[in-house]
Amino acid sequence: MEMPQGEKEMTTHTQSHDESVLDMLREDEAFAIEYLSVALEEIDEDGGEDAFLIAIRRLIEARGGMGNLSKNTGLARPNLYRSIAAGGDPKLSTILKVLQALGVGMSKVASHRADVGSQRTDQ
């Protein structure tokens, strides 16, 4: 069917779930902190360390990628990949530098869970 002259066909763009999550991690500071806080809360469970590293990798992807992170932290890109990869074993100092460079320091992430927990008990 031809469109009347001057009218444009409407197209609907839908994002995948992953794209939507990346957009929220990029644009919404509170969401990014909550996302990492949930992963941190589950770190002692089976697979929890890997889940936390996945959450960090997703935030890195959303906020400019590993090359950008390397520039902002002064850490070598290959070392970042190795540390934060599945099964990686990053030093605490690496995690702290990475989170700080991403704009969500560890203290924000850790204290957020404490704030959420106290709100639940207050209700």
Regions found by a protein language model. Give the residues of each.
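N-terminal flexible/basic segments that precede or flank functional cores
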Residues: 2-55, 115-122
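Residue at a beta-strand N-cap/secondary-structure junction
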Residues: 63, 89-92
